[in-house]
């Protein structure tokens, strides 16, 4: 497991922040039918019970948006991933199918409202991560997005540089079909509420769909 430190600048901007990190050995696949049955069921539930305007008021998403503002980012322009995924489904656009690890992280993010970083643990440089705030000119290549302006965004950094924000993770540490160890980080900008449930939900999906024993969970703040 990695050591994860929360910087003073994050603690000042979001004193209630708490996180859960989950590390596990996994076997990734291109597609899993059982997982997609769960994703499709959630999509039907969300679109039949939610209005577009409700999304930003979901408690975890709301707290993440408020943290963006305090860190210096406009959440209307740079949406937290959980919000962006829900808005996508509400517009009638299906969730993109990437691979089983990415898809199951997206499902937990959709269900809980937490923005979750999913990383190939073997691509992370060093054994220590720190959550800070992005700086002007700090280079960050978002997955499928190209260069992302992370100034004012919460960002996890390894010994080489940024690897993940609540808007997008970095191409350098992304999961793919060759991934055999996952590090998933659940970001609780609303505090500890729901963290354990989200982390255990990831564990359950990993056990069900990636031949994993579920790995271990560490909480940090």
Residue ranges, per PLM feature:
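Charge-biased, low-complexity intrinsically disordered regions
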Residues: 1-221
């Amino acid at each position: 497991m990695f050591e994860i430190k929360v910087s003073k600048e994050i603690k000042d901007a979001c004193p209630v922040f708490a996180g859960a990190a989950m590390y596990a050995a996994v076997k990734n696949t291109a597609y899993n039918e059982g997982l997609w049955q769960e994703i499709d069921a959630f999509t039907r539930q969300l679109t039949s019970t939610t209005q577009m305007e409700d999304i930003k008021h979901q408690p975890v998403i709301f707290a993440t948006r408020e943290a963006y503002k305090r860190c210096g980012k406009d959440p209307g322009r740079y949406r937290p991933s959980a919000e962006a995924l829900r808005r996508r489904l509400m517009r009638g656009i299906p969730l993109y199918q990437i691979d089983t690890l990415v898809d199951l992280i997206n499902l937990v993010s959709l269900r809980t409202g937490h923005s979750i970083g999913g990383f190939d643990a073997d691509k992370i440089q060093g054994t220590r991560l720190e959550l800070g705030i992005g700086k002007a000119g700090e280079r960050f290549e978002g997955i499928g997005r190209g260069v992302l302006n992370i100034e004012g965004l919460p960002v996890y950094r390894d010994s080489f540089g940024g690897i993940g924000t609540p808007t997008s993770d970095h191409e350098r540490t992304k999961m793919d079909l060759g991934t055999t160890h996952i590090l998933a980080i659940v970001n609780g900008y609303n505090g500890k509420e729901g963290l354990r449930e989200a982390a255990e939900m990831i564990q359950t999906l990993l056990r069900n769909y990636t031949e994993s024993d579920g790995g271990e969970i560490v909480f940090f703040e």
